Amino acid sequence: MGQGDESERIVINVGGTRHQTYRSTLRTLPGTRLAWLAEPDAHSHFDYDPRADEFFFDRHPGVFAHILNYYRTGKLHCPADVCGPLYEEELAFWGIDETDVEPCCWMTYRQHRDAEEALDSFGGAPLDNSADDADADGPGDSGDGEDELEMTKRLALSDSPDGRPGGFWRRWQPRIWALFEDPYSSRYARYVAFASLFFILVSITTFCLETHERFNPIVNKTEIENVRNGTQVRYYREAETEAFLTYIEGVCVVWFTFEFLMRVVFCPNKVEFIKNSLNIIDFVAILPFYLEVGLSGLSSKAAKDVLGFLRVVRFVRILRIFKLTRHFVGLRVLGHTLRASTNEFLLLIIFLALGVLIFATMIYYAERIGAQPNDPSASEHTHFKNIPIGFWWAVVTMTTLGYGDMYPQTWSGMLVGALCALAGVLTIAMPVPVIVNNFGMYYSLAMAKQKLPKKKKKHIPRPPQLGSPNYCKSVVNSPHHSTQSDTCPLAQEEILEINRAGRKPLRGMSI
């Protein structure tokens, strides 16, 4: 081997594992950290050991093997035994764009990010329901300022950026907000959640009982009407709900009103509160009761019309069932699954619409094949007198319900019915596994977040210092600042990070 080949060879020690390659290989990706190792003055810019003739980096050796192979082959693959965030950090350190990951490994690389987005989508209330934390904390038992700030940030935007208690409002606002919003924030929050759950169940039970004949006796009523020359008494009969059910509903509404007002007053972010669909449901379910009580004493015709309309829209009370999503993880998982599977549901609707249109048309003409000459409309021997009627039959058949109110009576119609049933099974079976997988993913993430131990303190890594082995000093020492190949963007980012840390030094860190 010639002397020129020896001078082109370079040794890189990453985490105790030595890697050998050629400088020409490192030059294939200019502007990256490894490309700077191929420069003549790299010995003064990185941690170089002249005795071992190697550069040292205290990084993950297994990930570096894949990164070095990217320089050799031009294809960047993601190791299956490395967590996604770790691989992402290594790519950022070596200055490699994540979009260079091969398509075969992109799903593996994106898996961790999708999981993080799924966890973040669960929103404010944490899924950690540790009994020890619940018993230890209360609205008056708070931890340090960091715990209060973290709790407030989880639930909404904080009015106190520094998280320090300063006054009655700043101290009690996040606690009372968590008391009514986060059932797992404290022991007393659990009591409030149990009370809310009890009133929800009582209200829904009362709503259902009000429709039973046993609780709606028929009473005789009289009404005096004004006529041209006097008055006229009109007798009529009307179903009237038992009074005790109205009283029970009134007690439930009083609790819901108190809960809603407390959440409105102590909400840190009023705009986000108004946009929340559950809060809109709470308001819509409460309002008709007060309007009905206020208008029940009026005798005008307009008031009676409005009162009759309010009695019709009592069904909005059933929407309170959605309040249970605050207390049950499974319901939240189902909601996130439905939102995440919107594309699959749209695809299913499109497939069903196409199938309904096709088979409704086919069954209409198939049933007309056997029509008698004296019955040109085929109304005597078939239920399918037109195509729109066939839409109902096609929907029932493709969804495998089969009510039996409409069915084909000719051999050609039976053949179309069989094809319609088979097509419906295949159409529904295609998007269902995707929806089931989404539910399984969200449920596993919810269980993982529920069992995740509470982190007391978060370690803040020390920023790279000037002269550090992992610090790229090319921007400081190199006289070239003109092109991307002569400028180290990684060093620029690290210098900006040091400058930011120098302007606002962190506790326990020396700059």
UniProtKB/Swiss-Prot annotation:
Any GO molecular function: voltage-gated potassium channel activity
Region described as Disordered: spans on this chain: 121-147
Inactivation phenotype: Mutant mice are born at the expected Mendelian rate. They are viable and fertile, but have lower body weight than wild-type. They have normal spontaneous locomotor activity, but impaired motor skills. Mice lacking both Kcnc3 and Kcnc1 are born at the expected Mendelian rate, but the pups do not thrive and all die about 26 days after birth when kept together with other littermates. Their failure to thrive may be due to motor problems; mutant pups survive when fed separately, but 45 days after birth their body weight is only 50 to 60 % of that of wild-type.
Cytoplasmic face residues: 1-190, 268-276, 332-344, 437-511
Main location: membrane
Motif (Selectivity filter) on chain: 400-405
Post-translational note: N-glycosylated; contains sialylated glycans.
Segments crossing the lipid bilayer: 191-209, 248-267, 277-295, 309-331, 345-366, 415-436
Topology term for the membrane: Multi-pass membrane protein
GO biological process: cellular response to xenobiotic stimulus; cerebellum development; corpus callosum development; globus pallidus development; optic nerve development; positive regulation of potassium ion transmembrane transport; potassium ion transmembrane transport; protein homooligomerization
Acidic residues biased stretches: 130-147
Residue numbers binding K(+): 400-403
Glycosylation site list: 220, 229
Superkingdom per UniProt: Eukaryota
Phosphothreonine PTM positions: 483
Assembly and interaction partners: Homotetramer. Homomultimer. Heteromultimer with KCNG3, KCNG4 and KCNV2. Heteromultimer with KCNC2. Heterotetramer with KCNC3. Interacts with the ancillary subunits KCNE1 and KCNE2; the interaction modulates channel activity.
Annotated function: Voltage-gated potassium channel that opens in response to the voltage difference across the membrane and through which potassium ions pass in accordance with their electrochemical gradient. The mechanism is time-dependent and inactivation is slow. Plays an important role in the rapid repolarization of fast-firing brain neurons. Can form functional homotetrameric channels and heterotetrameric channels that contain variable proportions of KCNC2, and possibly other family members as well. Contributes to fire sustained trains of very brief action potentials at high frequency in pallidal neurons.
Domain notes from UniProt: The segment S4 is probably the voltage-sensor and is characterized by a series of positively charged amino acids at every third position. The N-terminal cytoplasmic T1 domain is involved but not required for Zn(2+)-mediated tetramerization.
Family of this protein: Belongs to the potassium channel family. C (Shaw) (TC 1.A.1.2) subfamily. Kv3.1/KCNC1 sub-subfamily.
Protein name listed in UniProt: Voltage-gated potassium channel KCNC1
The gene coding this protein: Kcnc1
